[in-house]
Amino acid sequence: MSSGGLLLLLGLLTLWAELTPVSSKDRPEFCELPPDRGTCMGYSQAFYYNPSQNKCLPFMFGGCKANPNNFKTLEECKRTCAA
């Protein structure tokens, strides 16, 4: 297989992995934690998984010492927690 074909295959596999939903049985336990602003006084948008709505939602993150249900991007939250 040519290097171009391998790159195409790798790209397609990566896309498939990104789009494959996480089943609730495979979802990490920390996805059930409530949003945690943390103890610092920063002000930046982050995302957390809301299990009752089964989706990722924005919240304001203080910048440090929060629980692991805290993602920089919506895509990262969906990939990790959303079913």
From Swiss-Prot:
Site positions for Reactive bond for chymotrypsin: M41, G42
SMART domains for the chain: KU
Compartments in which it is found: Secreted
Keywords annotated in UniProt: Disulfide bond, Protease inhibitor, Secreted, Serine protease inhibitor, Signal
PROSITE patterns recorded: BPTI_KUNITZ_1, BPTI_KUNITZ_2
Taxonomic superkingdom: Eukaryota
GO terms, molecular function: serine-type endopeptidase inhibitor activity
CDD domains: Kunitz_textilinin-like (cd22594)
Pfam families: Kunitz_BPTI
Domain BPTI/Kunitz inhibitor, first and last residues per copy: 31-81
Signal peptide: 1-24
Keyword Protease among record annotations: no
Record-linked InterPro entries: Kunitz_BPTI (IPR002223), Kunitz_BPTI_sf (IPR036880), Prtase_inh_Kunz-CS (IPR020901), TFPI/VKTCI-like (IPR050098)
Tissue specificity remark: Expressed by the venom gland.
Biological function: Serine protease inhibitor.
Family statement drawn from the similarity comment of this UniProt entry: Belongs to the venom Kunitz-type family.
Name this polypeptide is given: Kunitz-type serine protease inhibitor vestiginin-2
Organism in which the protein naturally occurs: Demansia vestigiata
